[in-house]
Regions:
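Short, acidic loop-to-helix structural element flanking the phosphoryl-transfer center
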Residues: 1-14, 54, 97
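Generic beta-sheet signal
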Residues: 14-15, 71
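Conserved phosphate-coupling serine/threonine residues in phosphotransfer and NTP-handling enzymes
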Residues: 18
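Asp-based, Mg2+/Mn2+-dependent phosphohydrolase catalytic module
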Residues: 21-22, 26-108
């Protein structure tokens, strides 16, 4: 997974959108080098919002200075993907690396 994320990061700007807290984020940054691939972080504990709240995704779009149709949101929770899709973001449910690669071909 880390190598695929790094490959994506070499061609696209990547942001991490996570329902997390400061403790888990610090652990991830210390233990998973893939975290360095992301240019921006949208973290629930900093935003005081949680996915799948549509306001969460509006906040992300504002932070990215991006329109929904120019973004792809990938998550393993269908309700989060549905919420992002409802405001126009290309949403993909993560099930496996192979399926994700195939799904990304249709939106990138």
């Amino acid at each position: 997974m880390a190598s695929f994320v790094a490959e994506l990061g070499s061609e696209h700007s990547l942001a991490l959108a996570s329902n997390t807290d400061a403790i888990h984020l610090a652990f991830a940054r210390e233990n998973f080098s893939v975290m360095g691939t992301f240019q921006q972080f949208f973290l629930s504990y900093e935003m005081a919002l949680l996915k799948p709240d549509p306001a969460y995704f509006h906040h992300v779009l504002y932070g990215l200075w991006a329109s929904p149709e120019n973004c792809v949101f990938i998550d393993d929770r269908p309700e989060n993907v549905r919420s992002a899709s409802n405001i126009g973001i290309n949403g993909l449910v993560f099930e496996s690396i192979g399926k994700l690669k195939s799904d990304l071909e249709s939106v990138l």
